[in-house]
Amino acid sequence: MSSNSSLLVAVQLCYANVNGSCVKIPFSPGSRVILYIVFGFGAVLAVFGNLLVMISILHFKQLHSPTNFLVASLACADFLVGVTVMPFSMVRTVESCWYFGRSFCTFHTCCDVAFCYSSLFHLCFISIDRYIAVTDPLVYPTKFTVSVSGICISVSWILPLMYSGAVFYTGVYDDGLEELSDALNCIGGCQTVVNQNWVLTDFLSFFIPTFIMIILYGNIFLVARRQAKKIENTGSKTESSSESYKARVARRERKAAKTLGVTVVAFMISWLPYSIDSLIDAFMGFITPACIYEICCWCAYYNSAMNPLIYALFYPWFRKAIKVIVTGQVLKNSSATMNLFSEHI
């Protein structure tokens, strides 16, 4: 009898004095501090890192190109993940409770899905852009213009927002799972149970663009390899100014494709565990332990913080732009026309 009483006392609730409250599964104080530091660092990096990317591309006129506008829009999606998703998911993960209300739970879930797909669509369009740039660099400026980039950006935002809003604000995502959804619907929880049809739709929506990107980047690197061999074979010969220009353009586009290819690979690695886990869960009766699910979620969230690090590692112009912004030189009238590129490509 005494052991049962102590067990009841040990149970903690998200809202101690509210009927129907979710059970709270607390971490130790030390673990909570570590988790808040790890997750908080990711959120801060996602917000300020992507903010630097957006400011750099929008402020410096030298960076105003169709590709970079897509990159800035991608950074905006990752920035919004850092603002609207990661801080609240951090509290939910560490405290094992949702303290922000049911309405905001729906909004949070909607943002989570919408910005994920927005990132995926942006990366898919960037892959197409890079494919054209590398395979036909001299014709590329006439094919992928600023207006085409604007259309791609619009599609990358409108479709995910419409899809996410339609699925989560109409409640169709849990059709056929009403009993399970009601059982999990306690006060202080924000668990979204998605049925097999929508999980399969989500998985295909992730897999098909990912497959397209793999094909495109595979072709990009095959073409880049052929171009590099061609340049190497003709390197000892005297080049005309026209051939020299073609070589410089091709080299620049290959370098950009390589960097953005790393971004695509990082996205795939980050989101693949979550996508596979969601698919398995829906068809195997939601068997994934909570800790595994949270790890998959945070691997995906951390992708929003990775892109600025990739740009800083591979793009000298981004490092220079950061220095100009952080030191306050960006406030000078002449900063917008500053040269961020080295003379040699």
UniProtKB/Swiss-Prot annotation:
What's one Pfam family here? 7tm_1
The lineage's top-level taxon is: Eukaryota
Residues in compartment: Cytoplasmic: 54-68, 129-147, 224-259, 303-345
Entry keywords, A to Z: Cell membrane, Disulfide bond, G-protein coupled receptor, Glycoprotein, Membrane, Receptor, Transducer, Transmembrane, Transmembrane helix
Q: How does it sit in the membrane?
A: Multi-pass membrane protein
* Gene Ontology biological process terms, A to Z: adenylate cyclase-activating G protein-coupled receptor signaling pathway; G protein-coupled receptor signaling pathway; sensory perception of smell
The disulfide bonds in this chain are: 22-186, 105-190
Q: Where are the transmembrane segments?
A: 33-53, 69-89, 108-128, 148-168, 203-223, 260-276, 283-302
Q: Give the UniProt subcellular location, in the record's own words.
A: Cell membrane
- Mainly resides where? membrane
Q: Name one GO molecular function term.
A: trace-amine receptor activity
PROSITE patterns, alphabetically?
A: G_PROTEIN_RECEP_F1_1 (PS00237), G_PROTEIN_RECEP_F1_2 (PS50262)
Gene Ontology cellular-component terms for this entry are: plasma membrane
InterPro entries noted in UniProt: GPCR_Rhodpsn, GPCR_Rhodpsn_7TM, TAAR, TAAR_fam
Relay the domain remarks: In addition to the well known disulfide bond common to G-protein coupled receptor 1 family, trace amine-associated receptors (TAARs) contain an unique disulfide bond (Cys-22-Cys-186) connecting the N-terminus to the extracellular Loop 2 (ECL2), which is required for agonist-induced receptor activation.
Q: Which family does it belong to?
A: Belongs to the G-protein coupled receptor 1 family.
State the name under which the record lists this protein.
Trace amine-associated receptor 6
Can you name the source organism? Homo sapiens (Human)
Q: Source gene? A: TAAR6
